[in-house]
UniProtKB/Swiss-Prot annotation:
Belongs to the universal ribosomal protein uS11 family. It comes from Staurastrum punctulatum (Green alga). It holds the Pfam family Ribosomal_S11. GO terms for molecular function: rRNA binding; structural constituent of ribosome. The keyword Ion transport does not apply. SUPFAM superfamilies: Translational machinery components. Part of the 30S ribosomal subunit. One of its GO terms (cellular component) is ribosome. NCBIfam families: PRK05309.1, uS11_bact. This is Small ribosomal subunit protein uS11c.
């Protein structure tokens, strides 16, 4: 005799958060955009490499713009209205990613540069000679 099968939910329901934090990590080789809620739980992320850019194309401003648009597009449908932006790193995609976030329609409360700067800490590695 067959037992009635239990319904197993494979995925939790997506969280709805009206306010979030957008972290942009722009290195010289790639740009990673992570969207979290105010407690720090990751809701969405995207990078230039995950958007299909490979090699030297990952470090372009257009790749950073595409990564930012991909990370934010799902969350706007879920009801996110307001965001804080934290930008880290010296890469070429930081300005373009910020421009894409502004054009997405989210209300940006503030933009903060959280790039780590040493107060004369460790000695830097030697300069490359090419």
């Amino acid at each position: 005799m067959a037992r009635p099968s239990k319904k197993i939910s494979l995925r939790k329901g997506k969280k709805r958060a009206p306010k979030g934090v957008i972290h942009v990590q722009a290195s010289f080789n790639n740009t990673i955009v992570t969207v979290t809620d105010v407690r720090g739980q990751t809701m969405s992320w995207s990078s230039a490499g995950s958007c299909g850019f490979k090699g030297a194309k990952k470090s372009t401003p257009f790749a950073a713009q595409t990564a930012a648009e991909n990370a934010i597009s799902l969350l706007i449908d879920q009801g996110m209205r307001q965001a804080e932006v934290m930008i880290s790193g010296p890469g070429p995609g930081r300005d373009t990613a910020l421009r894409a976030i502004k054009n997405s329609g989210l209300v940006i409360s503030f933009v903060r540069d959280v790039t780590p700067m040493p107060h004369n800490g460790c000695r830097p590695s030697s300069q490359r000679r090419v």
